[in-house]
Amino acid sequence: VRLTRAFYIATREVTNTQYRAFQPNHTSGAEKYQQLAAGSHPAVMLSWQDAAAYCNWLSDQEKRPRAYAAIGGQLVLATPLTSGYRLPTEAEWAWAARYNGGGGSRRYPWGDAMPPPAGAGNYADRTAQGVVANVLADYSDGYTVTAPVGSFSPSPLGLFDLGGNVAEWVNDRYTVYPAGGALAVDPTGPADGQYHVIRGSGWRHSGISELRLSYRDFGDSGRLDVGFRIARTTDDKER
């Protein structure tokens, strides 16, 4: 993959307080009596469509062109791309998450080796025993479910929670990419498909494969461990 298009990406996941400015009655729910609805915690129990609708609403607040168009009752990425708020593409998310400076990349959010060091992020840890089935037995982050966004150390680019806290919706529809495929330039995902890609790990994850920054999941409805962050393409005045 090659990225040639400049973009902004939020340093933090969208919080309950921020999402409720758009949908005041939204609740992020609870897991085994553990509440996920605190204002500073990431907004969850949102479908991909809910996340895209928030992006359009935020664009409206700043009088930017909407990034998503309504077609057949569903929001889809507008073409050509606008400078409105949207979800990061999968390629943008992956580049931002794996960036390690000096041309290198990371295997895990904290570096290249297991286990995570103290304070690495909010994962399924000893604190979450009894709430999730599998935990990192020798790790404790102090949070049973979600944590306030930005509670742990940022990435080299200054981005928080690209691993841990909640997994995140990205723009692209889900597909299985063949190994050794042609170079993709600024990809935005397949044009069709029921499911969208989810990237990153969260408070329910403890497995080696789940904690890797290459981990991909997919879905179309809200989950207690999936939120989102916003991005947008730069406009001509910002380049």
Region annotations inferred by a language model:
Residues 37, 48-216, 220:
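Functional-site microenvironments in short loops/helix caps that host divalent-cation chemistry
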Residues 10, 16-21, 95, 117, ...:
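Short, solvent-exposed loop/turn elements at domain surfaces
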Residues 1-30, 39, 44-59, 164, ...:
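A short glycine-rich, aromatic-capped structural motif
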Residues 6, 113, 203, 233-236:
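Short loop segments at secondary-structure junctions
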Residues 217, 226, 232:
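Catalytic loop of the DD-peptidase/beta-lactamase superfamily, centered on the K-T-G motif
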Residues 2, 31-34, 74-76:
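Short, flexible, solvent-exposed loop/turn segments with mixed acidic/basic and small polar residues
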Residues 64-65, 234-239:
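Short, charged low-complexity linker/loop segments at the C-terminal edge of domains
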